[in-house]
Amino acid sequence: MGEYIMEKNTIILGIETSCDETAVAVVKNGTEIIANVVASQIESHKRFGGVVPEIASRHHVEEITVVLEEALKEANITFDDIDAIAVTEGPGLVGALLIGVNAAKAVAFAHDIPLVGVHHIAGHIYANRLVKEVQFPLLSLVVSGGHTELVYMKEHGSFEVIGETRDDAAGEAYDKVARTLSMPYPGGPHIDRLAHEGEPTIDLPRAWLEPDSYDFSFSGLKSAVINTVHNAKQRGIEIAPEDLAASFQESVIDVLVTKAARAAEAYNVKQLLLAGGVAANKGLRARLEEEFAQKENIELIIPPLSLCTDNAAMIAAAGTIAYEQGKRATLALNANPGLDIEA
């Protein structure tokens, strides 16, 4: 009988502070969540109708050590058990990113633990690996407040952006349309809920762009919604907000799903991964499931709602791959709000 050697588990501590969530997680072998703690600031930003960078940074300062201690306690481990610390280095709000990066550097230095920098969007993509093992080549549809892109991966750690937004990200368009309809921040979940009560009876544009393009554009759609509301007001016509929400949502989802499906076929991928905060959208999830149910050769992976919005488990998952590939950051690691995923 061959000798069985027990492989050592890789334990990664993830830290995420790119926007308005202070998050720390512990992940084993890149696939198993041991602890996942998130302190959200939505209530603090609600009255301003969006994230205020200065307020976000202050909250991160207050929360980071508390969340870090809570994650270690939940995972029932000490710093001695950790193989590496993975932290979001960008993109995001520079003041917010700095809190996480500096916390990660302090812990790495104090306990002599290797440090790995992670791209926030790589994290969103790797959230899917916490659900199911990924198979290459794959395509990820990334839809969040600041990003809307199609990312092709031929192997671990390799990211090729084959389509991206030329103006507003889908999440931005959701928030701006929600504001037009006098809905609270964040607008996405409110529009999603309202859309399910209405019918898409209002004719709104869809930006298909050039025939072979996988890029997106949502600024025209956003303007069309705002104009529709203003014109109706001026003419004294009542527009049902639920119908407007349904029409807007259908326009966004139609373009996202059609382009993702077209790209998945063209690039002959094995899986399509949904990623990012807007991945929590029920309408988008349902439409993707419907579209990919007919494609027997492409597996659709959709993360649970808790892994769609910003969290640190996804950063630890992406960080595991970087760590295993021998990537290391020095203590000179800095926040990079404009970090490129293809770099």
Curated annotation (Swiss-Prot):
Keywords: Acyltransferase, Cytoplasm, Iron, Metal-binding, Transferase, tRNA processing. Binds 1 Fe(2+) ion per subunit. Substrate binds at residues 142-146, 175, 188, 192, 281. It is found in: Cytoplasm. Pfam families: TsaD. It comes from the Bacteria. SUPFAM superfamilies: Actin-like ATPase domain. Fe cation binds at residues 120, 124, 310. One of its GO terms (molecular function) is N(6)-L-threonylcarbamoyladenine synthase activity. CDD domains: ASKHA_NBD_TsaD_bac. The keyword Acyltransferase applies. InterPro entries: ATPase_NBD, Gcp-like_dom, KAE1/TsaD, Peptidase_M22_CS, TsaD. Required for the formation of a threonylcarbamoyl group on adenosine at position 37 (t(6)A37) in tRNAs that read codons beginning with adenine. Is involved in the transfer of the threonylcarbamoyl moiety of threonylcarbamoyl-AMP (TC-AMP) to the N6 group of A37, together with TsaE and TsaB. TsaD likely plays a direct catalytic role in this reaction. This is tRNA N6-adenosine threonylcarbamoyltransferase.
